[in-house]
Amino acid sequence: MVDEQSLLAFDTQHIWHPYSSVSSDMPLYAVERADGVMITLKDGRRLIDGMSSWWAALHGYNHPRLNAAAQNQLAKMSHIMFGGFTHDPAVELAQLLVQILPNGLDKIFFADSGSVAVEVAMKMAIQYQHAKGEVQRQKFATIRSGYHGDTWNAMSVCDPTTGMHHLFHHSLPVQYFLPQPNIPFNESWNDCAIEPLADLLKKKGNEIAALILEPVVQGAGGMYFYSPTYLVKAQALCKQYGILLIFDEIATGFGRTGKLFAAEHAGISPDIMCIGKALTGGYLTLSASITTTEIAQTICSGEAKCFMHGPTFMANPLACAIAAESIRLLLESPWQQNIQRIESSLKQQLSPLSEKDYVKEVRALGAIGVVEMKSAVNMKTLVPRFVEQGVWIRPFGKLVYVMPPFVIKDDELQKLTEGMILALTQEYEH
């Protein structure tokens, strides 16, 4: 076992971390293990996890049932190519998904990661329109402050101004961007919010293959919660103009918003849905792009006679076995009560921050709590303050947010929010 200082030194010299400089002086912590909602550092400190490892670890860490699923599958096969083969884990996972997905979504294409699932969905939309003879439909529409991943076409539908990919703006495919829906979740609807989309489709609808949205909750683009009615109105317009509707549920899927899928808040089914992150309970990378039988058959009736995509690790049996067990574990748990409990606690415990002059807004939905600051936080000084308080929270930009594992207990959640408040108080008031 490598000692902490040697590990950190080698890491600093050779390993590149996400969204970081190779010469970064940002704080870096060596993790020894993780159990439940607790992360244990190599120096012995223990942190309550407020991030679910970026939305993924619904059941916490080191869960005995997920460990057993992994061990059982490892004894059979860890991987086999999916071209010309199928296997129990893929079929079992697909059976579970078909039972819980919004109505009509029954053709499942397994992919590697969330970003790749978005790429796959966009390729599906282009191939579908091409197969219908609508070869001029090469563009996509989306709303501002969205985030859909870090691969090429996924970046093209992230906000080009406020997003993380503005450096590539002049190289990426040019898409159509609409204003962020200006009606927050649970506020009364006004049709003015959908008018920009209606205007765009009236003028440019015959150029657009699909509209892609993060339903209800915008994730890394701003952690904004908007009215589900927008989705209902958007779907009607898409149908009117022959445009596919893609829902990116990579962050919101599997209960995070209080519904199994955020689309359920609107009571509708998209034409294509992307899932990932929590699909395997945070154990391995796996995603899926799911569509309808009609769309799949149309794609396969086109020029290529098939869908033109095939990842090496598609439907990896180890990942599929863990994902199937994660879904069973979720459905057998009182997950809805847990989400309601977490949402209620987050609203109550974070509310004092709304009175601070450095805070713009505090909001919570499901197991998501957001403190939006008036200016960007200093990660270099704020993250160590969280660690000193025994909590793991990783803010970005103006957003300090938590999305804890669903299994977090009341006392752990209180320690998480108290640590968050204390760290912010130290950062901004002392």
UniProtKB/Swiss-Prot annotation:
GO terms for biological process: biotin biosynthetic process. Its cofactor is pyridoxal 5'-phosphate. Substrate binds at residues 54, 147, 277, 310, 394. It is found in: Cytoplasm. Keywords: Aminotransferase, Biotin biosynthesis, Cytoplasm, Pyridoxal phosphate, S-adenosyl-L-methionine, Transferase. The record marks 19 as: Participates in the substrate recognition with KAPA and in a stacking interaction with the adenine ring of SAM. Pfam families: Aminotran_3. Homodimer. This is Adenosylmethionine-8-amino-7-oxononanoate aminotransferase. It comes from Haemophilus influenzae (strain ATCC 51907 / DSM 11121 / KW20 / Rd). The lineage of its organism: Bacteria, Pseudomonadati, Pseudomonadota, Gammaproteobacteria, Pasteurellales. The gene is bioA.
